[in-house]
């Protein structure tokens, strides 16, 4: 008796268009994974070992190793053989620096940051909003001893920073609520604001006095006072701030420091061709 032979249906070869689509999908995935690695490395100056980097990114060790090899060949990452750790490379800094250069007001702002530093004797910062986070573009360091600050290029939640609250005060309550929905209200310290109602009260106060205060909400022991720099449409272009230890930014100094920051921000607004918004009665 003849045995029935079950023949498997021949698989039709993929068209060139399908091959191209598969190649594109694979390429996009690799780019996303490589960028995740760079972003993770940028979070910690101490660097990461391969296994830790795989855990942080949720990728397999072999995938991370393969992508690191490519990134290292292009100098986007570098390997410290002494500690067996990976770090952000020089090329990442070069590419990232174009962000600050594109915001071509950074160089013009430096003399005003120096003035702010000299008037307050504290570190002066220039920051902008990027994707609903605060990014520090440049700063003029205080001559006083300072604890750690947000590093240049570092990102911090808008609700947890003086600069962020200064900018949020120019937004409608609906827009602020949307940002809270997107990013939450992280508790970074025991003094962080984690209730929307409390934040809205603070923003109303910021609108009245023209400057915002971060009172150890991002880092214990540090205070920050910030005011907005406006563009030619009276919209927030950036913000400047002074940061210092609570032992120096005392309650007695806050009002005077707030006035100085607000006035220098207004001067920088005019210098950049911006227009201060009309003060509502």
What does each model-identified segment do?
Residues 77-79, 126-127, 229:
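A structural signal for short hydrophobic beta-strand segments in well-ordered beta-sheet cores
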Residues 2-17, 145-218:
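Short, solvent-exposed recognition segments
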Residues 175-178, 182-184, 265-281:
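Cysteine/selenocysteine-centered motifs that mediate thiol-based redox chemistry or coordinate metal-sulfur cofactors
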Residues 2-107, 114, 266, 270-274:
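N-terminal helix-turn-helix
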Residues 82-183:
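Amphipathic alpha-helical effector-binding/dimerization core
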Residues 195-267, 281:
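Extended hydrophobic
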Residues 27-31, 50, 85, 89, ...:
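Short, structured helix-loop boundary elements
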